[in-house]
Each structure stands twice: as C-alpha cells, then as structure tokens.
Amino acid sequence: MSSLQNAREAPLWLDSFDESLHGRKPLDGPVSVDVAIIGGGYSGLWTAYYLLENDPSLRVLIIEKEFCGYGASGRNGGWCEGALAGGTEKYAKRSTMDEALRLERTMFETVDEIQRVLDSEDINCDFHKGGFVSVARNLPQAQRQRSAIELARERGTGEEIIRILDADEARAHVNATNVHSGIFFAPSAVVDPGKMVRGLAKAVERKGGTIVEGTTALSISTGKVVCVEGVVSADVIVQATEGYTRDIKGKKLDLLPVYSRMIATEPLTDSQISEIGLANRPTFNDGRYIVIYGQRTSDNRIAFGGQGNPPYLYGSRIDSAVESNLHSHKVVWENLVNLLPQLKDVAITHRWGGTLAIPRNWLPGLRLDKRSGVGFLGGYVGEGVAAANLAGRTMADLILERQSDLISLPWVGVRSRKWEPEPLRWLGVRVSRRFMGAADTSETKKQKTAKLAMRVAHILRGD
C-alpha cells in the first residue's frame, strides 16, 4: 500500500515512449480541407483511417487539443471488447430486435477487424485475443449470469461467443475470492491502448491525413471550425471529442464526463501469475454494479481500474488534480486486493485517471447531418476501444455515401436528449452511485438481489 503514494502519476501506457508525445505542430492560420475531425483519439483516427483507405484523394485534417491519445484513448483499461454499452433492448426499441442483434453481431466481428488493421499497418500494441471473464462473487451475480446466458441462447448466440463457467472453471481463469461461477465472452482482446492510438495516428499520416496537435477548437458551425489558432473550413466536420465535448461551444450538456481511475503493478513473477490465473490474458472483472476492470499486460503487470470518488465534478469540470487523487486510487487498490488478495504486497508503479463520456440515454451512437455536413460519434460509456472502430468505419461510409450494411445499423442516427442543468446533474450522479454502491454491499452481505436500490438507479439512468 505504501507504494501507491510513491507511484508515478502518469498513465502506464504513455510512459514508455522514446519519442515526444507532443511531436506534431499546431494549426498555423486558416486552412481549407474536405473533412475536419475534432479529436485525436480512437473515434477521430478510425474515421480518418477508413476515409483515406476508401478515398486517398481526400484532404482530411484531425484537430487535437493536446496530443493523440491524451484523453480516454491513452488512459483506458485496454479492453478491446466486441460489445456496446446501453444494451440490445434499447437499440431494439428504436428499430427491431433483428436489427439490434445485427448490431450486436457486427460488434462481435469488430475485434477481428481491428486485428486485421493492426497487422496490415504493423501496429504492435500487444494485441492478444484471450477473451473476457467475469466472475460472480455472490448469488445475485451468479443469477444474473445465468439469466444472461439464457437470454443469449434465446437470441441465437452460441457457446462459441459466450458461455457459462462453473466455479472451478472460473477460478482457473481468474483465481479470485468467493467465486460462485463465471462467464467467458470470446470476442475480446487486450491491447496496450497507448501503443494502439499512437500507431493508428501514424497510419493515418501514412495514408495522407494531417494531424495538428496543441490546437484548441472553440466552436462548430456549417462548414467551419473556429480554433484559437485559426479557422478551418471543411465540407464535412466530425465531432469526436467524447469526455471533452463540454469544451465545444453549446455542447456542454451533450455528454457527461465521468472519472475512472487506474493503477498498475510492478511486473509479476511467474509464480505470482500462477497464483492468480490469467494464463491466457483475458480481460476480467466481477459482476458488481460499480464496475471494476483489469488485464494482465504483455510484461506481466496487472492494470486495474474502477470509479473511485468523486465520479463527477460539479459543472462538468475536468481537473487533472482529481485524476491523481490518492484516496480514489486507494479505493481502486482495495478493490484489486479484495478480488485478488495474492497481490496485496505487490508494488504499484503507476496511477492515473481520465474521463469517459455518458449520453443521457446511455446509448452510444453516431449521426451525420447531410444539410450542415456536421457529424458526431461517441458516448461509449467507457466501452469505446472496439466500438470506436465500428463507429469510425460507419461514419466514413456515411460521409462517402457508400451503401454498406453499416449505415443502417440501429445506432446510426441515435440522438440523446441533453443532460439536466446543475445541480440536478451532480445530484443525479451522486444518488445513482450511492444506490449502486448500496446494492453491491447489500448483495454481498445478504446474498439477495437488491431490487429497490437498483430500481432507483435504473430510473436515474433512464432505463
């Protein structure tokens, strides 16, 4: 525990590059392009990549306030998982169940598409497709797992995608405490997100795209992005700003920036790894409501995250001091040791935080207004590593007017209502988190589903 205070306050993923993270020049005065993309994370880079792959003649400009990978794309848990936040049922309500399941299957396939691009572009980001394992550590969690498997079978999803694990099988994957059962989800991989986002940026440049960093976009209107450093004129403008959407004029209530924190251990020995499992490097968590997440890195560290406190700052503020809050990282460490007590004496070398973005309807999506030429993609609720690829591919098809199967998926055209003004946003987050935390505590203590607490949390989430 003492090592936590001495850990580097920096993302593990961005701490090993020999080159400068700030290697690209800012915008230098007005410029005209075909497509301007605001945001140098996964969403913006994948959009640019597929645009240029399909039409190399396009003039594509990415505008990044800091450097590529500064935001969630360089700070996340490295879960490249073929799943979307929000749930199939919500997408079915705005289309049909068949279409919602088509979106689900397309997400399953997206992990392999990402691997294809990484291989073809020679991007070494420690990609390893070891699946995802969620262990149930109390009876309500186990019951939810069984219900999830039953529902998957009813909808035609087979064991090659998702299957139940008994207690022994689950412990063989993740040797956690109090394991009742588990779920194995095959279309999931681990990545080093920093290597992935930096490699993707270079791939975009090789294809002819231009990236300006240290460039602050202030506002978007038809055909124009106003930046501190100059005005960008463009036929199409794509907003890919995720947790930093509040920085764009008039967009403060579009997405809620919520904090997540991570820690990374020192590299483990072979004997330590044998004690905790994770032999095939699956991503892992348990079935609690306040999400935790982890992976074993290619150099045998455990990178582990969770929400901590506070999850949200009044007025949608983003504060780097909060990202490195020691108390929040202590909560993450306690969750890790509660799950895997074998690691209680292992040193923590890095601790960091970042923001994820939540739309009011909790549904990720994308849209392109043909009249104004302005598009948006994101709102991934913390599950954007793989989803951003599908969103970027789809946005490219919309811009190029390609009649692909992607442009009719039911997350295309999703538009959430805006978040409530303060203090309602702040109160809503605090109440929702308190009820979910109470549900986790109650279920562990009583071994019964916390129905009332979760009903209130679902109402606040708009479920």
Regions inferred by a protein language model and the residue ranges of each:
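Glycine-rich Rossmann-fold phosphate-binding loop(s) that bind the pyrophosphate
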Residues: 39-45, 65
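Internal hydrophobic alpha-helix adjacent to the cofactor/substrate pocket in enzyme cavities
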Residues: 52, 387-409
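Glycine-rich FAD pyrophosphate-binding loop
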Residues: 52-75
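Extreme N-terminal leader/targeting segments of oxidoreductases
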Residues: 1-35, 53-59, 458-462
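Helical element adjacent to the flavin cofactor pocket in flavoenzyme catalytic cores
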Residues: 143, 150-155, 177-235
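Helix-rich C-terminal "cap"/substrate-channel and partner-interaction subdomain
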Residues: 321, 339-342, 359-364, 375, ...
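Active-site substrate-recognition segment that forms the wall
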Residues: 120-128, 219, 231-271, 275-372, ...
